Amino acid sequence: MTATEAPAGASLPQPRENLSPFAVAGQILCVLVPIAIWFSPLDLAPQTKHGFAILAFMVIAWITEATEFALSGFIGCFLFWALGVVKFDVAFSGFSDSTAWFLFAAMLIGLVASTSGLARRLAYTIMLHVGATYPRILLGLIVTDFLLTFIVPSGLARVVILASIAMALTEAFRAARGSNIARGMFLILTYTGNIFDKMILAGAGAITAAGAMTKFGGIEVLWGVWLFAFLPCSIVTVLAAWRLTLWLYPPEQDGLSRGHEYFQTELKKMGPWSVAETKAALLVGCAIALWVTDFWHHIPPTMVALGIGLAALLPRIGVLGPDDMRRLNYMPVFFVAEAVSMGNVLEATKGLNVLTTVVFHWIEPYLTNIFSITAILYWVAFVYHFLLASEISMLGTSIPLVMDYAKTHGLNPLQLGLIWTFAAGGKLFAYQSGVLIVGYSYGYFEARDLVRVGAWLTVIEFVVLMLLVPFYWPLLGIH
């Protein structure tokens, strides 16, 4: 996989040729469980019950990876229509929703940054100025990861870009594959690649959540408000991830004698700014400027992203061509559209009301104030993510429930939606994110390392969130 191809990947695990016993069991359950629900004597309207049967197929397929994620979603949407649960325009409504198109446009912008060389130049420039000691290089990797999130929305793409730099640095340090130096760099660039796109409205998961919040919460989700809501947490995460890695994996050596020379050499190889890089910088700069100021002009983030993405395809103005469009992996876009469609079907069949009542019944007595609401939603979402490995399916199936609960109980849908989405960033196992799977596949750290770092950062971010929600968010109008 190359950096050019990376943005097309999004956060979906690659399909495997040899199915695990777990996946085989999932394929069996995908048939038996929906049939059992379809013909069960549940006290529900037929349309609601049949919708749940197909929903069970989709969720089981996503949990067990019985088939490729997007294929499972396509089958589910088709069954909603073919079996008469809802009409075609509802079963496939997600494909006309702005959420999927936002992701498509974000992937185009990421492709602009990577194919033009802009992302790599930015990475080398930052690394050149942070210093040549291991602690400074590690901090530079984390800061670069965060800044790249603005121009390369795909966490997978950022991991691929930074991994190529980290491998060269590992060689420069003459560090072995299992050394603390190599382990620390790859572990933290992988994990932060997974969480930064929850703090910025950039990755597929955050985009899916924002679309569901708009649809089911009836609210306007602004890119700038999202950025500033999590900006303090972003800063804390950068520093906490840096110090945590140095503490858990102290380097065998501190300095890199030719660190500055290495980055200067790489920048020299790239030469002066090319026309493509200049165009890419202008296009991405326009997108970021419009996103950050959307609280003023109220141009939807999707409109900005799609406008810039299409401009990048225009002759003479853009930097992408027909071949770039052909290389783009559209499966993540389809997957998001299918997750949105599923939520719309739940609403149309009244299944959303049933699920909200069941899911929130046992936690409702404890949701008494802003502190308990924040804590319970955070940890419930964290645990729920163990069941639905994909962030898109996790957020696509749960955000509608959170929005419905917020509206029926007089709570702020934006506040609850941001808390729930942010909690999706906390992970312990590679299977929970395609980004983690790709980082883990390089072989520089082990599964237990991911658990250690993930557990610490999940707790740290929870503490920060408990301070932001009641004290900082009201300053932004999020009460």
Which functions belong to the PLM regions below?
Residues 2-35, 155-158, 174-183, 187-209, ...:
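Juxtamembrane and boundary regions of transmembrane helices in multi-pass small-molecule transporters
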Residues 42-52, 56-74, 91, 239, ...:
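Flexible hinge motifs at transmembrane-helix junctions and intramembrane kinks/re-entrant loops
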Residues 200, 289-290, 339-357, 414, ...:
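Hydrophobic alpha-helical transmembrane segments in multi-pass integral membrane proteins
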